[in-house]
């Protein structure tokens, strides 16, 4: 998808056949024809989130053609958590940010990420042989994707019975939360294409994994600041595995 005008700088190639460019205070996420529906979903969620108390990117324009689509959004001030060094203050700020998203009124959110739909997405990825091993844990890489999916299916009834529905980010990784590098106050949230009502543990599992993988720290301080006294280890493991099977 060709962007209008000049001066666009490539920032990154995304996980879902998208590319991100920047020109000044404007970001443009582009995709080919096959990615239009997914990018449109992100646009709609970003527009909804902008109507809430959660800070994030504002949708500036939407361009669609036979070549694909482009979503133009405002830059969010601050630095991603992934680009900042670990500190107790930053972990506490991250917990407050995730909690703020989760405290948005469920009844006002028009988007859902029902477990059965996410499992169906994982089934499609496994069926196509498209599981990305980069998203799997070291132990999971040693197991056939079909067996991993079978484990998800077996655990699904118990997780469904225990789920706590909140507005979830859907991809609650460190690069998607930005903070003031001096005060470490939360400045905004980006990449909300998977936002929707879901079990809060679908976000908590990703945050826990990121803290351990990127900062090599225990997630206990995060859970304490978030307000979970005894995290459910089985639900954390379930959602981490399920998420890994949906990227492909």
Regions found by a protein language model. Name each.
Residues 63, 81-147, 151, 157, ...:
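A cross-family kinase active-site recognition segment
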Residues 234-248:
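Short, basic/aromatic-enriched C-terminal tail that caps enzymatic domains
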Residues 36, 164-167, 180-238:
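Active-site Asp-x-Gly
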Residues 5, 54, 162-163:
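Short coil/loop residues immediately preceding or within conserved phosphate-binding loops
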Residues 1-8:
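Juxta-kinase regulatory segment immediately upstream of eukaryotic protein kinase catalytic domains
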Residues 12, 16-24, 59, 150-202:
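Active-site acidic catalytic loop and adjacent metal/ATP-binding pocket
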Residues 12-114, 125:
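ATP-binding pocket architecture of kinase catalytic cores
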Residues 40-43, 92-96, 150-153, 205, ...:
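Generic alpha-helical structural signal
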